[in-house]
Amino acid sequence: MGKRLTDCITSQYIGAANRLGSKSARRRIVAYVESYDDIFFWRSILTRFENEERYFEVLLPSRLEHLERGKKAAIMSMIATGGVGRNMIACVDADYDYVAQGATYSSKTILDNPYIFHSYAYAIENMQCYAPSLHNVCVAVTLNDAQKFDFEAFLADFSTAIFPLFVWNVWSYRNATERRFTISDFIRSIEMGTISPENASAAIAQLRRRVAHKVKMLQSQHPGAKESYLSVKNSLRELGIMPSETYLYIQGHHLFDKVVVPLMKKVCNTLVRERERDISRQSVHATQQRNELSCYTSSVGSVEYSLRRNVGYVASEQYRRIVGDLERFLNDTSDAITSTQNHNPSPSST
């Protein structure tokens, strides 16, 4: 089957198209992302770099007769064939590629290629669950600013509790062993079941006991791993991964669906009921009460939707690192383009 033109597009192709435009036209840089959910996240970052000289177009990669998502499929294929470059970049979730530090093919490819940008955190779901921003999300959902639950303290406790097991998980990916402790094994080990603001402290205490038990099992299975375990632990700290922020580096879907959303729904339900009681108490008559309650109910948002659109991560260190990577890329490519133009003067200047 013949290839479509869109399957042959590379950075060089985009660069050639840019040169065909007028000198005053802005340079187009295509940014390929993994899924629909990633489009808003990367667009919110790339927008700050657009000016009179350049603009970004965020796209999903198309392959053959269908759309493939995930960097292990279309994006990794595009990278392997040399598609990325100054005019075409890939923006991906880090998954474990950042913490693996080149121990796998995927990790080495993503960390070594200057045209691939990653989230540092495991996925954008982790960034959307950035702890200092979660109270503001509750306010956006409920229009009630009362603080009923300390998300920052909870996620710090959760992170500290699972950190020893997280180190073992990363150790397993950096060190090929016969008994691999997989991400799935790790996630099963930190499952918290039904969680609510009322039982959060007890759930954390139980989690600590379960983690300690699993750590002892792993230590018995790998009695000679103490030195390499400590080396991985120190390496993670050098990468800026603190025990209290482990939640940013675990599987994003688990954090989002099993930890943050269930908690936030319960907190928001409490805030909504509180606001409804306030309206009922302050209403002068039944008609006013019905009108006010109807107006308020129609203004209450969705927890999942509000989290998906949460941009509070702009205050995070991970966001600052992404911005720094993009700044270096744009500075380097701008210098390269200027150098090329200086070495290829127009006919009128010769």
What is each stretch, according to the model?
Residues 1-350:
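Acidic, divalent-metal-binding catalytic cores of TOPRIM
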